[in-house]
């Protein structure tokens, strides 16, 4: 197996490569290219150019650059022989890019080659355990991504790397706030779960609150400051939804997943705790609990991307449909940004 990576930043080093090593006793050969020559993670053979990387007979190409450059790389990848192209979330970063993306995917033979990835779309254990029979059994859904954070010398909250827990040295700017950057995770998990419960893709959302890293409201016309936390509200398949996003939720963080409130009074909770997912069926003081070990990237790569059971193998038509859903979600979140900040 020959894998290629365009963009060799932290997500490759701390998420993809460890997951690949854990999944395969004989680690696949990995090639990569990055415009920054200092980025050379162990286990990846660097190519001198993107063209050189694309000239190899890659089994799967991963586009893992910053989101603003996904479209540019994807256009070149589609012009290459690469038959399986996986684009990290969000697949694009602006509304004008959405229109260009749709034109690219409309080219003959393109859509079935491109999978828009959000690794949270593999978190379907509430469906696998058959804890909710049908979306009509649900009266309310809550989605959460409340990330642990640290503090700088001034006592201000700072972001932490999601995989290592080390301080994130990046200065986050719009559009890399929580609405687009991590809201994609919650929407992907939410929509895939509801879809398997025979729900529809219909979704509406609005911004209730959005604040920066220091807790100040995002002002209309501010096209620079990233949101540090946000509360989104709406519905999916007719069910009321509240989504809570926070990149600065304190040293312990908070819930990372979904809670389904059922008509019979029970609650289904799907959370990420340490190195495992935890699924709970709550009925008063009685709690049934399931533990799902392994990183989310391991589950996603094993179940959707690589190997004989990948989505490309078991259901090729779902590749383009999955990408369409991820594009719809990004479009919705980018539209919320327009409403929050003004046209831009």
What are these regions (language model features)?
Residues 1-43:
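N-terminal Rossmann-like dinucleotide-binding module
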Residues 27, 80-84, 110-113:
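A short helix->loop->beta-strand "cap" motif at the edges of active sites that frequently abuts
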Residues 42-86, 90-104, 130:
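Beta-loop-alpha module in the N-terminal Rossmann-like domain of NAD(P)-dependent dehydrogenases
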Residues 60-63, 209-211, 302-344:
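C-terminal helix-rich "cap/oligomerization" subdomain common to oxidoreductases
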Residues 164-240, 246-252, 331:
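Rossmann-like dinucleotide-binding domain that binds NAD(P)(H)
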Residues 220-229, 233-304:
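NAD(P)-dinucleotide binding in Rossmann-like oxidoreductases
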């Amino acid at each position: 197996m020959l894998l290629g990576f365009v963009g060799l930043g932290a997500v490759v080093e701390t998420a993809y490569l460890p997951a690949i090593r854990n999944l395969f006793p004989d680690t696949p050969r990995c090639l990569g290219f990055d415009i920054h020559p200092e980025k050379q993670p162990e286990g990846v053979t660097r190519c001198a150019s993107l063209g050189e990387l694309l000239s190899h007979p890659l089994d799967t190409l991963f586009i893992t650059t910053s989101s603003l450059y996904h479209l540019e790389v994807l256009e070149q990848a589609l012009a290459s022989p690469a038959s399986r192209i996986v684009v990290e979330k969000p697949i694009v970063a602006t509304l004008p890019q959405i229109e260009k993306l749709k034109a690219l995917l409309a080219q003959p033979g393109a859509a079935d080659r491109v999978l828009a990835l959000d690794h949270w779309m593999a978190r379907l254990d509430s469906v696998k355990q058959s804890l909710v029979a049908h979306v009509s059994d649900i009266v309310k859904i809550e989605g959460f991504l409340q990330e642990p954070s640290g503090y700088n010398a001034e006592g201000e909250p700072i972001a932490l790397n999601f995989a290592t827990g080390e301080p994130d040295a990046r200065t986050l700017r719009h559009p890399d706030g929580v609405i687009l950057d991590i809201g994609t995770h919650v929407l992907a998990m939410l929509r895939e779960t509801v879809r398997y419960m025979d729900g529809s893709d219909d979704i509406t959302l609005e911004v209730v609150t959005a604040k920066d890293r220091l807790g100040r409201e995002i002002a209309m016309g501010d096209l620079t400051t990233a949101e540090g936390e946000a509360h989104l509200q709406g519905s999916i398949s007719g069910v009321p939804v509240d989504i809570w996003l926070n990149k600065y939720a304190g040293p312990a963080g908070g819930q990372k997943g979904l809670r389904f409130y059922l008509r019979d009074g029970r609650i289904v909770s799907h959370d990420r705790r340490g190195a495992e997912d935890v699924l709970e069926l709550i009925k008063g003081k009685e709690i049934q609990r399931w533990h799902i070990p392994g990183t989310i990237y391991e589950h996603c790569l094993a179940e959707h991307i690589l190997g004989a059971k990948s989505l490309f193998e078991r259901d090729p038509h779902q590749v383009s449909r999955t990408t369409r859903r991820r594009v719809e979600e990004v479009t919705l979140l980018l539209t919320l940004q327009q409403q929050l900040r003004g046209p831009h």
